[in-house]
From Swiss-Prot:
Residues 34-54 are annotated as: Disordered. Keywords: Protein biosynthesis, Transferase. Pfam families: Formyl_trans_C (PF02911), Formyl_trans_N (PF00551). (6S)-5,6,7,8-tetrahydrofolate binds at residues 110-113. GO terms for molecular function: methionyl-tRNA formyltransferase activity. It catalyses: L-methionyl-tRNA(fMet) + (6R)-10-formyltetrahydrofolate = N-formyl-L-methionyl-tRNA(fMet) + (6S)-5,6,7,8-tetrahydrofolate + H(+). GO terms for biological process: conversion of methionyl-tRNA to N-formyl-methionyl-tRNA. It comes from the Bacteria. Belongs to the Fmt family. One of its GO terms (cellular component) is cytosol. This is Methionyl-tRNA formyltransferase. Attaches a formyl group to the free amino group of methionyl-tRNA(fMet). The formyl group appears to play a dual role in the initiator identity of N-formylmethionyl-tRNA by promoting its recognition by IF2 and preventing the misappropriation of this tRNA by the elongation apparatus. Coiled coil: none annotated. It comes from Mycobacterium tuberculosis (strain ATCC 25618 / H37Rv).
Amino acid sequence: MRLVFAGTPEPALASLRRLIESPSHDVIAVLTRPDAASGRRGKPQPSPVAREAAERGIPVLRPSRPNSAEFVAELSDLAPECCAVVAYGALLGGPLLAVPPHGWVNLHFSLLPAWRGAAPVQAAIAAGDTITGATTFQIEPSLDSGPIYGVVTEVIQPTDTAGDLLKRLAVSGAALLSTTLDGIADQRLTPRPQPADGVSVAPKITVANARVRWDLPAAVVERRIRAVTPNPGAWTLIGDLRVKLGPVHLDAAHRPSKPLPPGGIHVERTSVWIGTGSEPVRLGQIQPPGKKLMNAADWARGARLDLAARAT
């Protein structure tokens, strides 16, 4: 099939590469978000998908208003048979959805109808889910609600960060998307409606959302930190110093004997503990402002923390 591929961040690359290399499909153009400011100088940079397409000589479309009549006409002139979507980053309206005869097929990183929205991988980890996956479905104007073509499942490991899990889902999801498009092309696949039960929503995670709430139970704190690692990254204030945190550990065997209030800090020779709403957790790595991630105990020794210091 003649395909337009819509995607923006790095997790979309596995799908783009697989479709480019498929003998069954022809990626005639890539649709991605406009170049965005990046780095210390804030210079506009192309998205990972845009860079990949340019390197392979595939035309790149970067409309600031993808639902405008002008872009609908531009896409119509390309005459795609189907549009494949992986983390494009914008809602698509009815006129645009009507352009390709086989519609728009989205790869979403959850087992729909669970975790519709922008951050399904993060939501699954934060909620303590043990199984997740990826779903291919036909896009409709409402958010992630269209009929389903196929699914693939993935076990969430106890130490998975969002980055770890997303890397695996990007690969298994790429295979699912390719298989789905093959089935659509030869008319073997018919989508089925999503179940009415089990709907949950995973809104976009902001930097403010990534601030650690030490009043929550330790297991919840641990999951929430993994859910925002590596991006946007968990953070807390220690005194008036804002620091980023790597994953923390529920190390019951070596927990300090004295209780710690939520946010209370206990420094030992080789470890740093912070109190939560239940038992304390052991810090792994910490990133002070302007520095790289480092061992929390090494940082604490150099920082000479006040004995009354608290994380908030």
